[in-house]
Amino acid sequence: MMAKAKALIPDNGRAGADEGNRQAWIGQEVLRREDRRLLTGTATFAGDLGVPGQLHMRIVRSTQAHARIVSIDATEAEKTPGVRMVITSEHTRHLGSVLLEELGYHEIYENIEDFSHPVLAVDKVLYVGQPVVAVLAVDPYLAEDAAELVSIEYEPLPVLLDPEEALTGKVELFPGRGNEGARIKKAYGDIDRAFAEAEHVIRHKYVTNRHSGVPMEPRAVVVQPDPARDTLFIWGTVHVHDNRRIIAKMLNLPEVNVRMKHVEIGGSFGVKGGVFPENVVAAWAARTLGVPIKWTEDRVEHMTSTSHAREMVHKLELALDAEGRILGMKDEIFHNHGAYFRQAEPLVSDITAGIVFGPYRVPAYDATLHAVFTNKTPVGAYRAPGRYESTFARERIFDLACAEIGLSKTEFRRRNLLTAEDLPWTPGLDIVHEPYHFDSGDVVKHFNEALEAANFSEWLEESKRLRADGRKVGVGLGVLMDKAGLGLFETGGVEVSRAGRVTVKTGGSSVGQGIETVLAQIVAEELQIAPENIDIVHSDTELIPDGVGSWSSRSTVLAGGAARKAALAVVEKARRLASEMLEADPDDLELTAGSFKVKGTDQQISLYEIAAARDPFTARADNDEPGLAADAVYMNNAMNYPYGVTLVQIELDPDTGGHRILRFSTSTEAGRVINPLTTRGQIIGAAVQGIGGALYEEFLYEEDGQPITTSFMDYLLPSAQEMPNVDCFVTEDAKSPDNPFGAKGLGEIGIIAAGAAIASAIDDAIADGVHTDRLPVTPEQIFSRCQGLNKAER
């Protein structure tokens, strides 16, 4: 059944209501403005672009997981008609590897550049799919044919795939530097005392296997040079300001000579973020040859070369008192980064180590994370990176604890979740150099309300009745906590034109989350105009000199905060000008329907009329700036930590190992909802991906490092047919005090606890004493357990 949502977002008297004479746009279900161009096929993607005279780039990728490059023979490829150049590391060696220090990661990881990704492989390859050679030709088919003529001789080396084995030293991927890029320690409290005084100590190992976002649209980039000005125009990247900064430095260009331009990039989910080596090769080639370069990856390339995610091992230990209250938690984590560090991923290891304890009262905590390298595709961020994996481990060991000490899953959570009296919770560790600060809320209260809203007790009773009738039906849950708003600033600008339009510029980017719609609502409320009169400009470094971008559920709070700040500055300037033009006291002016009105009179002037009156000559005569515009930088004091619970009821088919999710509910404390429609959409989309990671998706490898899952024939994705109805229960009881909206990030909520809740429900359905400790759960595993082929084990 197609995923849909039950409307369980409270109105609170705001949505669509007027506050006095002011129109409240925040809280309304405004339709996404992005959807029309996407649904009608009028949106422009990088793959749609065609620049006269462009060459097409094809990458020759490694066929070996670990090998020395003995020789490269491109003679036949270079002879092919239509081929303009064959690029190897001899051309790009001087560029080095994709820079990481430019993003500040060296503050977390010492010597991080030792492990960054080469532009093209130099002397050796570390994974199947690594770029080795680039072929440029006049059309993509010639480029592909010529690429197949490139002959590369390899000397195979021992292959390393297991993250725990990476620390044994049997195989070194980086000779003299080992396979551990970093070791991260996070701790607070007296962990030794906690375990010494514990009545119950529970230990278990949990594994989340490798999968990723696999968006419909693969990566693509177009680079157009302007040789006269030594300038590059680049389309097709997510984080435009990071790409500009890094590509400019690698090519030894001033940043102003690299101009990132907006184009639709489709779904990202984190996996398209950062700077990829192919982008650098395309930029270098365009500048070197003075002609446009276009590159689009195919699906096999995407599955083997675009960032993977999720592969972690958690060796978790839990200390409890006699009543089942948590005394302490220890975790040793092995994070499989694949062959190199990529842009986003160094942050994920740090976040993971600092967030395993979740929204619980944990007096003592000690986590050590090993960021290790293997001969697999490098990993990157994927929706709720670090949170999905750590939540699975934590919630699963809590279920194990419930079985050992005789508590229900719900009662154990109630005894240990944070309450209003516990907050703010600042235990004394940092996440990415920011002190962990759980600012507001009441997790226990929300937990109880979410269970009641879903009628969870009925789920439990129904499942018992159905099991008594011989059906394999079970119920599971997982409590979640997200970390949102990473990256402490964002830029924005608002300009009112005389033509009756408002332009909002933002350093954020559109990756499918509806940022254009939400920013229009935020600015509309401050200017008191309709959102449809507002245009949003983003992802263009010529128009927006600086910015951070959209990731880590930060757009509403940070991009929205910057847009609101700029809008307020416009309102204040307009109020001053209106008071002069209407000869009225500023305090007697009220802004409604886009116009300043003098209270008690019919005198008024619109924002557009004020903008028109501030032409350069008039403004100069008044010693004022022309126009009606303002730019702003919004600085956030801290990240925010939304929380919630995911509930699942599942039925298993013992004869096939198949499964059907009967009910799925996810809740969150939102602080404040800007647009209920986009909120539900984000929760549903994330839930679908969480179900995929729990039951369907996995990148598999042969023992020699050859990838098995290289197409959608092998890599399973849930379709609409497999999706349950998704109920969303969203409360607005705990506004975050650290941002002007009181909002918390919501883009990743639906995915975080999906794996944990589904695993919990599967164990409940089978009730064989076996503890699910690995994702995804396959039909083969379910069949085996239902047929009694597994012995109970922990």
From Swiss-Prot:
The cofactors required by this protein are: Mo-molybdopterin cytosine dinucleotide
Q: What class of enzyme is it?
A: oxidoreductase
Q: Which example biological process does GO assign this protein?
A: nicotine catabolic process
TM annotation in the entry: none
| Keyword Metal-binding tagged | yes
Cofactor binding notes: Binds 1 Mo-molybdopterin cytosine dinucleotide (Mo-MCD) per subunit.
InterPro entries reported in the protein's UniProt record: Ald_Oxase/Xan_DH_a/b, Ald_Oxase/Xan_DH_a/b_sf, Ald_Oxase/xanthine_DH-like, AldOxase/xan_DH_MoCoBD1, AldOxase/xan_DH_MoCoBD2, AldOxase/xan_DH_Mopterin-bd_sf
Q: Which GO terms describe its molecular function?
A: 6-hydroxypseudooxynicotine dehydrogenase activity; iron ion binding
* Zinc-finger is among the record's keywords: no
Q: Partners and quaternary state?
A: Heterohexamer of 2 alpha (kdhA), 2 beta (kdhB) and 2 gamma (kdhC) subunit. Dimer of heterotrimers.
Question: What is this protein's record name?
Answer: 6-hydroxypseudooxynicotine dehydrogenase complex subunit gamma
Instruction: Please tell me the species this chain comes from.
Output: Paenarthrobacter nicotinovorans (Arthrobacter nicotinovorans)
Q: Which gene encodes it?
A: kdhC
